[in-house]
Regions:
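Conserved phosphate/anionic-ligand binding catalytic regions in large, soluble enzymes, centered on
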Residues: 1-2, 164-177
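Extended, highly charged
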Residues: 3-141, 145-147, 151, 186
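Conserved small/polar residues in nucleotide/adenosyl-binding loops
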Residues: 178-185
Length: 186
């Protein structure tokens, strides 16, 4: 962010959004502008965009063919909003409003705590695809990786794990089934 001329402030003073935009420049620019407007309407300051450096040559043909344009957006925490959950709630609202207004952009994550790196590739390709994950300057307290092949849907960039808040192996439906009241309990 320093190289881009952005003053993001201290820890948890900013939110980072990871976006999968359309490759088409006009549609991408329209979606970016829409997000900027929504952030401002939600009382926050939009700081700028960053192209996420990637190495598509490590991916398979199909993944490259449908690869989105990957960018990060930076949002400054308002002075009147506390760090942590209050700020993340504001970011959540901005994300949801944006998702309702944009059909062809996927918000991978938007948070002051986490940045989700994901895609349509194997676990071993994660680090080689995203240049950020190879950088000595990049630090993280925790990293979670999840790998699973799609069993009942076609693979896509947005369906790849991890999701914004958790990693799972598809057993959620089973758990829900076991916790639902039985018809015999009625």
């Amino acid at each position: 962010t320093r190289a881009l001329g952005m003053d993001i402030g201290g820890e948890r003073e900013y939110g980072v959004g990871m976006f999968f935009f359309p490759q088409e420049e006009l549609r991408r620019n329209q979606a970016k502008k829409m997000f900027e407007i929504i952030v401002e309407k939600e009382g926050m300051e939009f700081l700028g965009w960053r192209e996420v450096p990637t190495f598509p040559n490590v991916l398979g043909h199909k993944a490259v063919e449908c690869m989105p344009y990957i960018m990060q957006g930076f949002v400054k925490k308002p002075a009147d909003v506390e760090k942590g959950l209050p700020f993340d709630r504001r970011l959540y609202i901005a994300r949801r409003v944006f998702e309702q207004s944009s059909d062809d952009t996927y918000v991978v994550s938007l948070s002051s705590r986490t940045i989700v790196y994901k895609g349509m590739f194997l676990v071993g390709q994660l680090r080689t695809f995203f240049a950020d994950l190879q950088s000595e300057d990049y630090e993280s307290a925790i990293a979670m990786v999840h790998s699973r092949f799609s069993t009942n849907t076609n693979p896509s960039w947005e369906r790849a794990h991890p999701n914004r808040l958790m990693v799972h192996n598809g057993e959620i439906n089973t758990c829900l089934l076991y916790t639902s009241p039985s018809p015999r309990d009625s």
